[in-house]
Every structure is written in C-alpha cells, then in structure tokens.
C-alpha cells in the first residue's frame, strides 16, 4: 500500500513490462490523446474489431520510499491501461480499464495523470 503523499521517480512504458497475471483494479475516464500525452503511444494496438483489447499501455512505475529503519528503497508498480470490448480504439472520452497486481496500479496512474494536469 502506497503512502498518501507518494512520489513517482520514473515511469516506463514498454512492451517488455511483464503484465502476466495482472487483472482489473480500477478505471479512469479520460481521452486517448491525454493518455498518449502522458504515457506515450500505446505499447500494443490492434485494429481487429473482434479483439477484446484494441489499445494497451504496459507501464512500470518506480516509487521511492524510506523503510522503518530509515533505509531508502523503491517499489516497482506494474499497471496496464486498456479498452475492453469496444471493437475500436476509443478517441473520445472513455472509461479506460486499469490493470495491475493490486490497487497501487490505480494510484500510480491517477497520480501520473494529476502530475501532468498540475504542470499545465
């Protein structure tokens, strides 16, 4: 569980991020363009209308923390953002699915989106 005031040191959007065994943790309503602005282009796209997922970002967030003994370390939080059974890549405002190993994935996605909004 992440602290309320956690920071994100790094965000990696890459095809090699291991998302095996992740599952739906939450959702975020935003646009395709905003996701591309924040995370870059999707790491996977598929135009086939019969596929369950047409656009997906595989993400790994590096979250630093200090443990109880004062030693600095970091968590790697894996997240995915994807559409589900739309038959196309949504470009309008859409309720995107957030996958991960736990709810930290949702926290990191929201935090990163908020960081970009605050900088504008």
Named regions from a protein language model:
Residues 2-120:
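Residues within mature, well-folded domains
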